[in-house]
Each structure stands twice: as C-alpha cells, then as structure tokens.
C-alpha cells in the first residue's frame, strides 16, 4: 500500500489527528493534501471521505453500534475511524460498491491494528451490509430530538435548542440543509472587475457559474475547489465569501468618504467589502486582538487593490479610545454554528457552556462599540451563528442597557427573518446561504 497516495488511509490519518488536536478540519485537510501524492481524482475522494465522515459521525456511530459485538468506546480509535469511513461509503457514496468499501476497510484495519482487528472489521461491516435496510431511528413523533439528531447527525443539545426556538419541522429542515454539499460563493471585486467579466473568465475554464440570490456582486461557482488555483483569485479580481456575510456590508449603508470602525475585523472579508462599496474612498480602521490575523487583513486589502484600510491591534472588549464615527461594525466572535455546512467539525466541538462564555464577551464588545458611534450613526451587530443566546437575547439586552440606541429597520426587501424589523436571521434551508444574524441600531 502506497500510503501517501491512498485516499482512505490518509482519511483515517486526518480523522485521528482531528481527535488529537484543536486544529480546524479544513486546515488539517489542506495540509495533508499538500504532503500527499494524491491524484486530483483521489483528492476529491479523500476530501469527501473526511468531511462526510465528520459530518455524519453520530449517524455512522449509531449504525455501527447496532451491529458491533463490543461497545464503540472499546474499539481502538484508529480502527473506529476505519469503520466510520467504510460505513460512510456504504450509506452515502453510491458510486463506490459496498464490497470495495469493506475490502479496503479490512486492509486499513490491518494496517492500523493487526489481523484480529481486520477480522473484526470484516465481520462487523458484513453484518451492517446485511442489516442496513432494517436500521431504524426513534420515531419523529415520539422522540423528535433523538430522531433528528441521529438521522441528520447533530448533537442532542443543538437539536433541543433549535426545536425549542423554531419547532420540529424547521429544525429538521435546517439540519438537512446543513448536510447538503456546500456551495461556494465569490464576491466580485468591482474595483478591478465586473461580475460579467468574472463570470466569462470562470466559464472559459469550465467552471459552472450562477448569479447570487441577493447581491449583484456575488456569484456561485461549482465545483468549489476549481477557483483555488485561479490566477484571478490571486490577482484580487474576486474574493471567496458567502453571500450571507456579504449582506452585512450592504446593511451598514456606507458612503464614499466616511470613516468606519470594524472592531473584530480578521480576516477582512467585511472590511474589504465595505471599502469596495465606498469606492475605496474614506477610511476604515480594522481592529483585532491578533497581529497575525491583522496581517491577513492587510494581505487581502493589498491583493484587492484597497488603500483605505488601516489595521490596529486592539481588544474590542476594552476601551480603544476612539472618536465617534458614522458607522461601526461589530462582527462578534461567536460559536459559528451557522457555518456547519462548510465546517462540520464545529458541531462536535462547541458546547452550551462555551457559548455562555461567548455571550459575555459579545455584550462587552457591543457596549464598547456604542461609545464609538456618532449621533445619528449606525451600529451593525453580526454573527455567523444560529443561537438566540448570541443573537436575539444579546440584542434585547443591548437595547435595554443603551436607551440612546434604537433598532433601525432593514429595507423590506432585505432577506431574513423572523424577528424584529431591525433583525435579520438567515437560515440555510430558507435562504440558501450560511446561517447568519444581523441587527442594526441607530444612535
């Protein structure tokens, strides 16, 4: 077995590393591909196996546990990952014959274990093949939390909260949408190109291009990986950004010549979009606690041909000593649950306790931001998550604590809902973008 060129072997290696480290899954995958000898075709299979197995981990473990002669926690972690990858192919990859998935898994179990683990793997997977059509989830009517959690592979606590906030039907639709193949949006940099030029360029390279749903500068491209090696991306003619995030810059209603504060800026997607909408005229002060992350903001601005962004290291929970300006953006640190379609590892790494700690930080930042807004100015609060703890409840608290601010209604055509006129929640199954939240205030 040439391990550096075997997508299944490398998938197991990556899953093992994910469990042993705090690195993001995407970073582990990118690093592994760079070190491997995988063909372009096998890179696609490797990526599908890793992301798919992580995404559907709870569902896969449920299926494996029904046919295993021993508890899953008693199985060697690497061998359990072999079993998960094989089960993922059996349940979700029609193009791979089940027998091939089993045979390859047996080889991997031998490589990561011994002859005994190979025999155990063979027996378990063949039982799963024989009984998979009889596998059943708890009833949706009798136990909706377990049904949705097991069917769509989500932690119980997330499903419980979403059902509490939005009901069973909405939660099932939301979870299903989070498991769909993620689309890729790009934002055309109108300082350098037009949407028509970028569309024609990408189509000439055999890339499928569709218009965004809400914004003229957004395009949707398939396959997603096709733009990574494109010269136009390096030249700054476009920027990879989900349409939900791009809506934020429009919500702030900036004008050329204004001064804008972006208090949690890195990696700079919203700051560079604001500069684009300001026609590169005015000033944007971009803050972040990390100088390393601010360097990424500077690199992105330079590549996009933007000269009005100035970066400054600063902790937005503390007083930055800033003079009031017409526009302030708080893209708050959050749990990121709205991005689980692109980042499936998030669902297994976040907890309700961690979110409660984030809420305290979000309130601190928003309170500090209030003092930087000039009378009549706008303050925009955004997150890429779907918890009312971090969204609606933070906003309700802010308005109660800061009576000199009021909610500023969004234009009626602005997508999102339900909520107050000054709030917009974007749902993947309703709006076909990443989960996102915005609240707009006027001082």
Q: Where are the regions a protein language model picked out?
A:
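S-adenosylmethionine
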Residues: 1-443
């Amino acid at each position: 077995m040439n391990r550096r060129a075997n997508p299944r072997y490398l998938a197991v290696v990556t899953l093992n590393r994910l469990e042993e480290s705090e690195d993001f899954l995407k970073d582990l995958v990118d690093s592994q591909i760079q070190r491997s000898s995988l063909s372009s075709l096998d890179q696609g299979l490797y990526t599908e196996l890793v992301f798919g197995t992580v995404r559907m981990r709870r569902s896969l473990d449920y299926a494996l546990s029904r046919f295993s002669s021993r508890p899953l926690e008693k199985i060697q972690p690497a061998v359990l990952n072999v079993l998960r990858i094989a089960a993922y192919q059996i349940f979700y990859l029609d193009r791979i014959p089940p027998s091939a998935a089993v045979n390859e898994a047996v080889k991997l179990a031998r490589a990561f274990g011994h002859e005994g683990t190979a025999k155990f793997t063979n027996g378990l997977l063949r039982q799963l093949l024989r009984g998979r059509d009889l596998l059943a989830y708890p009833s949706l009517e009798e136990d909706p939390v377990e049904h949705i959690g097991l069917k769509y592979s989500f932690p119980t606590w997330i499903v419980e909260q979403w059902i509490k906030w939005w009901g069973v039907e909405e939660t099932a639709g939301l979870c299903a949408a989070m498991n769909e193949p993620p689309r890729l949006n790009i934002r055309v940099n109108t300082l350098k190109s037009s949407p028509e030029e970028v569309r024609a360029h990408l189509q000439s390279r055999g890339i499928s291009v569709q218009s965004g749903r809400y914004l003229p500068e957004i395009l949707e491209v398939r396959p997603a990986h096709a733009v990574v090696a494109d010269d136009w991306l390096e030249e700054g003619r476009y920027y990879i950004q989900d349409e939900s995030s791009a809506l934020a810059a429009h919500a702030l209603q900036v004008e050329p010549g204004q001064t804008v504060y972006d208090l949690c800026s890195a990696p700079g997607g919203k700051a560079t979009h604001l500069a684009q909408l300001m026609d590169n005229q005015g000033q944007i002060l971009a803050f972040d606690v990390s100088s390393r992350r601010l360097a990424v903001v500077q690199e992105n601005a330079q590549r996009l041909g933007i000269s009005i962004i100035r970066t400054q290291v600063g902790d937005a929970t503390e007083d930055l000593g800033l003079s009031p300006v017409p526009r302030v953006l708080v893209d708050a640190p959050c749990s990121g649950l709205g991005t689980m379609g692109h980042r499936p590892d998030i669902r297994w790494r976040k907890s309700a306790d961690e979110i409660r700690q984030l809420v305290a930080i979000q309130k601190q930042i928003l309170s500090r931001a209030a003092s930087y807004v000039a009378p009549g100015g706008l303050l925009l609060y955004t997150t890429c998550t779907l918890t009312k703890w971090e969204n609606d409840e933070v906003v309700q608290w802010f308005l109660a604590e800061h009576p000199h601010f009021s909610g500023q209604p969004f234009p009626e055509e602005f997508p999102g809902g339900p909520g107050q006129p000054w709030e917009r929640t974007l749902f993947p199954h309703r709006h076909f973008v990443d989960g996102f939240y915005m609240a707009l205030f006027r001082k």
